[in-house]
């Protein structure tokens, strides 16, 4: 491997000749050999750094034209665009487990954009600190990257995934409107319910989760950029914060604004905690929905067997013909991971000492993993399971009419205690509710048939 020599305030460092990073990134890659190649800084954060560096350059060009010249701006924004597009992702090797402020990742972005920009310009034009990092600090850029990446992940990936599954459940509701089945509480038989009503509960849960996600986006639109080192805005020109937020909004098409209090923006991560809470709520509902589906699909002969789900792959290496609810299991595992991540996000967010939180990389890593996993799990569940759910009408009818809880319909006619006696007799002797009720002398056969209609109990 060939190397070139780069330098920083600590001296010279050898860097791979074919990489755009420079001295500080190289030092970090050597000093933090933790999760190398596996737990690298999320691509979403790198993408966000490209956006904010471009936005900062555009703002500086207006507020400091003598420093951010047209020539520098052209080279810098072209290089930043390549970061945004993902073309330069191989030049961002740093792991999550580094400085808690994300300083090395900020410098990674500065160095890559500077060196690539210089290559575009054909001369040494850009300096990573003086130009790419102009009017900024790692302390305000990393919180900004966190918010940009969080908004893009939720708006562009998670919410669309939820919308798709909501649409699937709406279709299933319409297709199964007339089917009545046993309801269940405490995993025990309960009074009847329409299958469409059961599905509507799933759909409504997702609609509420969508509302919560949308609500959580509001605080995330506030950006720390312009607060610089401790929130005072030192070395940033007046008006930079509002202008750079407007530039980020223009680049992304999202309604980003400057945070009203930069001291809060640098040290507190309450917006991230709040948003992850909404993500966790969605994970909880997906856990419930996936569990419902796999219970209803259990069988085929010894379980509930009230629905059929798509057969995507062989279910067992030893039992031929077995079909497992694998998509449901994947969703529930993702839900567990998201719930665990919520603890990590909460703990990390609580570590804001004085003017800066120094657990930001782990906070961002877990937040973005939650959103990414949940969005992809929902898409997979919708495509490979939910969209192919088919009701087994015969099994639903059999289970419904074999349920002792239908006795509830007799309460107005024979009273609660007599209804309980009827159910217990039917269960103990293995006979129908009708036979038990008639033998106990509570109703005649004719009267029982007149008042007992499970389909009308919904």
Give short role names for the model-derived ranges.
Residues 1-458:
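Conserved, well-structured ligand/cofactor-binding cores
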């Amino acid at each position: 491997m060939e190397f070139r020599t780069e330098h920083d305030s600590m001296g010279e460092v050898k860097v791979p000749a074919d990489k755009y990073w420079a001295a500080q990134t190289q030092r970090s890659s050597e000093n933090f050999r933790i999760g190398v190649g596996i737990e690298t800084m999320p691509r979403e954060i790198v993408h966000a750094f490209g956006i904010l560096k471009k936005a900062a350059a555009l703002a500086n060009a207006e507020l400091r034209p003598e420093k951010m010249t047209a020539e520098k701006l052209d080279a810098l924004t072209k290089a930043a665009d390549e970061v945004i597009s993902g073309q330069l992702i191989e030049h961002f090797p740093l792991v999550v487990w580094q400085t808690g402020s994300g300083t090395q990742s900020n410098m990674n972005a500065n160095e890559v954009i500077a060196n690539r920009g210089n290559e575009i310009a054909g001369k040494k034009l850009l300096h990573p600190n003086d130009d790419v990092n102009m009017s900024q600090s790692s302390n305000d850029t990393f919180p900004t990257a966190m918010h940009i990446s969080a908004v893009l992940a939720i708006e562009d990936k998670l919410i669309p995934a939820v919308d798709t599954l909501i649409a699937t459940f709406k279709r299933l509701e319409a297709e199964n409107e007339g089917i009545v089945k046993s309801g269940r509480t405490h995993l025990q038989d309960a009074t009847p319910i329409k299958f469409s009503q059961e599905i509507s509960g799933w759909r409504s849960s997702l609609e509420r989760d969508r509302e919560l996600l949308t609500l959580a986006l509001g605080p995330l639109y506030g950006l720390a950029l312009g607060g610089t080192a401790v929130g005072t805005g030192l070395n940033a020109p007046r008006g930079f914060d509002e202008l750079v937020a407007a530039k980020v909004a223009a680049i992304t098409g999202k309604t980003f604004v400057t945070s009203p209090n930069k001291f809060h923006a640098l040290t507190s991560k309450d917006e991230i905690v709040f948003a992850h809470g909404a993500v966790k709520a969605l994970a909880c509902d997906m856990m419930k929905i996936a569990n419902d589906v796999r219970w209803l699909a259990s069988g085929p002969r010894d379980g509930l067997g009230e629905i059929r789900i798509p057969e995507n792959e062989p279910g067992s290496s030893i039992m031929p013909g077995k079909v497992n609810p694998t998509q449901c299991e994947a969703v529930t595992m993702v839900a567990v991971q998201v719930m665990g991540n919520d603890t990590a996000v909460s703990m990390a967010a609580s570590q804001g000492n004085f003017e800066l939180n120094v657990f930001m990389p782990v906070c961002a890593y877990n937040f973005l993993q939650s959103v990414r996993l949940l969005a992809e799990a929902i898409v997979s569940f919708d495509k490979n399971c939910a969209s192919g759910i088919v009701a087994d009408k015969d099994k639903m009818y059999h289970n419904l009419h074999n349920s002792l809880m239908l006795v509830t319909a007799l309460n107005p006619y024979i009273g609660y205690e007599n209804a309980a006696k009827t159910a217990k007799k039917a269960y103990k002797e293995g006979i129908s509710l009708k036979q038990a009720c008639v033998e106990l002398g509570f109703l005649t056969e004719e009267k029982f048939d007149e008042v007992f209609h499970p389909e009308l109990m919904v």
